[in-house]
């Protein structure tokens, strides 16, 4: 099989692979919710992809016959992309950053198996190298499905 220009473009757009993400975030199956990162500027912003598949365990019960991605998992996927913004900042202490709060999160439409979430996060603030806030948006086919601000803190 030969590479086509389209496959070359798709490969060159991957900034972080799933293996590289696993080296930066502590999450593992079934809670690793970022498949790849297509844009990443440490300390500024990140854009990640979550491919939603019917094989994910949450769809067994949410909801039988009409699978919908739980909103809490959409928010968690946004938080994981947000976490990638700070993981490679050299002046931050190493450790586990966890949720400290969420503000203004809104869900605009359902996310279903077959959808591809494109999640973009921007760092809004970072205080004392321990507390931060990101603005997050998740879109499917260019349509906003979820947005809000997520806070995190470093756990000792």
UniProtKB/Swiss-Prot annotation:
NCBIfam families: fabZ, PRK00006.1
Presence of the UniProt keyword Lipid biosynthesis in the record: yes
Active site: 62
Organism (species): Parasynechococcus marenigrum (strain WH8102)
GO-annotated molecular function: (3R)-hydroxyacyl-[acyl-carrier-protein] dehydratase activity
Gene that encodes the chain: fabZ
The keyword Lyase appears for this protein: yes
Primary enzyme class: lyase
Location of this chain's protein in the cell: Cytoplasm
Reaction(s) catalysed (UniProt annotation): a (3R)-hydroxyacyl-[ACP] = a (2E)-enoyl-[ACP] + H2O
UniProt keywords, alphabetically: Cytoplasm, Lipid A biosynthesis, Lipid biosynthesis, Lipid metabolism, Lyase
Gene Ontology CC: one annotated term: cytoplasm
Family per record: Belongs to the thioester dehydratase family. FabZ subfamily.
Listed GO biological process terms: fatty acid biosynthetic process; lipid A biosynthetic process
Enzyme Commission number(s): 4.2.1.59
Intrachain disulfide bonds: none
HAMAP family on file: FabZ
Stated role: Involved in unsaturated fatty acids biosynthesis. Catalyzes the dehydration of short chain beta-hydroxyacyl-ACPs and long chain saturated and unsaturated beta-hydroxyacyl-ACPs.
Protein known as: 3-hydroxyacyl-[acyl-carrier-protein] dehydratase FabZ
Domain of life: Bacteria
